[in-house]
Amino acid sequence: MFIEQLPSSLAEIPKTAMILAAGHGRRMLPLTERIPKPMLVILGKTILDRSIDNLFCVGVTKIIINVSHLASVIVEHVGARKDDRIILSEEELPLETGGGVMNALPHLGKEPFFIINGDSVWVDGMKNTLMHLAEKWNSNHMDALLMLTPTVKAENFDGFGDFFMNQDGILSRRKEKM
C-alpha cells in the first residue's frame, strides 16, 4: 500500500474510528462458519488487521470494534495485538449497523469519526483513501460523509451496488435494496 506523508494539519482527520465486525457473514459461507468475515486472510493479512493498520496510519488514535458472531475469535486476535488504543464493543446479538454504532457511542464521543465495514478491503492509489475522505469533510455542511466506489471499478463484483448516482452526483438508494 502506498502511503503519502500526513498533512501538516491533522485537525480535520478524525481521531476515532469504529470497525463494524459483528455480522454473521452469511454471503461468505462456508468460509464464515468458523471464522468471522473480518478475520478472513487476504495476501497473508486479515481484513480486520488491514483496516486497523490503515486507520492508525492516517492518525486515528482510538478504534472501537463491535463483535458478536464468533466474537471470541476477534477478541483473542485483537488481544494478541496488546494495543490499548483498540476497544471492543461486545453485543450479545448483532445489533445491525445503527444499533452497533449506538451501542458504541459512549466510546465514540462527539467529534467526527470514521465507520468502516469490517469486511471492506480497498487498495489506495496515489492518495490514501481515508485521508482523501477526511479532506472532503465539512462540518459546516455535513452530518455524514459516505465513501462509495463505482461498481465498474470494484474487483470481482457483478452486482448493482446499493446506490444509484445520477449525472449530477446525487445519490439515491436502489429500489431493490429498500
PLM regions: where:
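Short catalytic helix/loop segments, enriched in acidic residues and glycine
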Residues: 34-47
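Conserved core of the sugar-phosphate nucleotidyltransferase
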Residues: 82, 123-178
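Conserved G/P- and acidic residue-centered "switch" motifs that form tight phosphate/ATP-binding loops
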Residues: 23, 37, 119
